[in-house]
């Protein structure tokens, strides 16, 4: 008989589901006020999609009729619920990843794995990038050839700026976070 292997990410989500069930719900609502209780779930919007965390078993499900969440989406939600600090608030002070509290050691990896990929992926595809941000209910910004603010969560806005390549420069992208982002989630490298 062949043994079925379970991904470590799936195992981690299962652990987080159990951890969620032990969380003080009143405290959780104070730390993440955007949570709403509905039909046995705490609901939350993540990148424009509606999810529910089951109050019965701690699992996360799609509530918008689209595909079920993948492990990255689930871990983003679980870490927000687990690490958001009470009293955290949006400061409206925009900084690159490297300037977030305690993020500097991870900045080179973030640059290579996120910002550089963002720039390369959308080079020559400004129209598609605009359409993607619009699908995420993004708010257009005046900076860059394409600039939008979107929300990873209501409490965690992000700003994306893109400059198309030209005869002198390669395409450039930048992703800015509100300085308070690490008060809401310690694992921003995955968002």
Positions of PLM-derived features:
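Short Lys/Arg-enriched alpha/beta "domain-start" segment
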Residues: 1-40, 73, 82-136
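Amphipathic, interaction-prone secondary-structure segments
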Residues: 28-55, 140-164
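Conserved binding-pocket/active-site segment within a compact domain
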Residues: 123-183
């Amino acid at each position: 008989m062949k043994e079925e292997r379970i991904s470590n990410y799936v195992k981690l989500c299962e652990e987080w589901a159990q951890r969620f069930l032990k969380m003080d719900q009143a405290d959780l609502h104070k730390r993440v006020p955007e949570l709403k209780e509905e039909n046995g779930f705490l609901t939350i919007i993540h990148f424009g999609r509606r999810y529910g965390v089951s109050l019965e078993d701690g699992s996360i499900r799609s509530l918008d009729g689209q595909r079920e969440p993948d492990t990255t989406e689930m871990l983003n939600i679980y870490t927000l619920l687990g690490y958001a600090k009470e009293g955290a608030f949006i400061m409206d002070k925009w900084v690159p990843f490297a300037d977030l509290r305690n993020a500097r050691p991870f900045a080179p990896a973030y640059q290579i794995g996120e910002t550089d990929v963002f720039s390369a992926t959308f080079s020559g595809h400004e129209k598609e990038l605009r359409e993607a941000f619009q699908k995420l209910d993004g708010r257009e910004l005046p900076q860059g050839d394409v600039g939008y603010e979107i929300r990873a969560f209501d409490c965690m806005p992000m700003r994306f700026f893109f400059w198309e390549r030209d005869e002198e420069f390669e395409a450039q992208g930048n992703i800015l976070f509100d300085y308070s982002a690490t008060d809401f989630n310690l694992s921003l490298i995955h968002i």
